From Swiss-Prot:
One of its GO terms (biological process) is lignin catabolic process. Residues 1-101 form the FAD-binding FR-type domain. Belongs to the PDR/VanB family. This is Vanillate O-demethylase oxidoreductase.
Amino acid sequence: MLDLMIRGLRLEAPGILGLELVATDGSPLPTFEAGAHLDLHLPGGLVRPYSLCNAPGETHRYCLAVLLDPASRGGSRAVHEQLRVGQHLTTSAPRNLFPLVAESSRSLLFAGGIGITPILAMAQVLAARGDTFELHYCVRSRRLAAFIDWLEASTFAAHVHLHADDGPTPFDATALLRDAGDAHLYVCGPGGFMEHVLGCARTAGWDETRLHREYFAAPVQPAGDARAFEGRLARSGLTLQVPAERSVAQVLDDAGVCIPLACEQGICGTCLTRVLDGEPEHRDSFLTDAERARNDQFTPCCSRARSACLVLDL
């Protein structure tokens, strides 16, 4: 764990707060790769992952930007309302679930709204390497585009394309993805935006191995489709009943079984747990289709069981 201090807070766009974090003792911070995130331990015991958006070569600071979500479960609201300059925060070391491919002839970076944060770090790395890339930044309005002035003044401004709903340059994912070649696509943003972009890429013949994405929020699950099941913990010998209205993670916590949690939506993989027997009902946005098909792990923060019982490696 890292002990950091908030050195700066800045409103990057309406509803988007930028944070600059430094080591409390002034020492260099652990290095990170483009696409990485920190798990912030926030007031009230909340832990939430936020993407690093500064240049990965920087070791004197970490920069984040957090959108105040009207449907916040506490994380973004705590950041906006409770954090102050000079305050200390505990965080994880940087972790990367959305890495750049080491060698690619061309990269297409698609960001929707606050999805610009990991994409911003990627653009800085690609520019520093001299790689061929395009950054397409989609927002409802230019005034809502965090970092746009910085991007348009950057050394790679010619690679940046802003698509605002109220602007002159409409976003046409089909046209942009038509001639894929051997390019790699990186997309981050709201779920609907991401599914549209990925759907256009698949229709255009892109191979799944060249599609990279990171979700910031889980898809909404249909109401009333959850059912109760039994969870058996192989190592501790406990048998727990998981009611329809509660998650496995909540039931484990009630029983005093601690597992690591961060997003609590199935998007970060922090709580990934081995399944020894039974069939999970995967509701996460973290595992690949191939990983889901093996049914040997699941995310207890949101996923459930298709079988009457799951045996977990806990």
